[in-house]
Amino acid sequence: MVIPGVCICSHCEFHDRASLTDRPGWLRLYGAESLNSHFTQSLLGCRQQSFYMEAETKVEFQPENFKQMAGLAYYYNTQCYYYLHITWDDQFGRILSIIKNDLGKGSYPIGMGVSIPEKGPVWLKLTTRKETAQFSYA
């Protein structure tokens, strides 16, 4: 799969988990297993090549339950990552939350997250400065 201006992935086999044609101008990823999975994740990744970097994406996602998530991950492996994601909370509706996975132990460093509008896109951003990583959204 080739994503213009982003990266070339000649060895990737997305099959039915990703599409550049279902919605022209957008990359659509279809859900699979969690970031903890060693098998079928729906994940597009690029290697961090500098201590100073920014990654930003626009996400349109309307989850129907708490098991559905989409977002931006700072990912080392299945046991070590931070994941800023849109999901669903039965009390607050659509929310933005962070999962921290440290050596396989998951936690929610900002609690249950923050409410966001029920519909519409959300911009997610990751900024790193040496040993510091910061997520932001708009």
PLM segments and residue spans:
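Extracellular glycan-recognition regions
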Residues: M1-A138
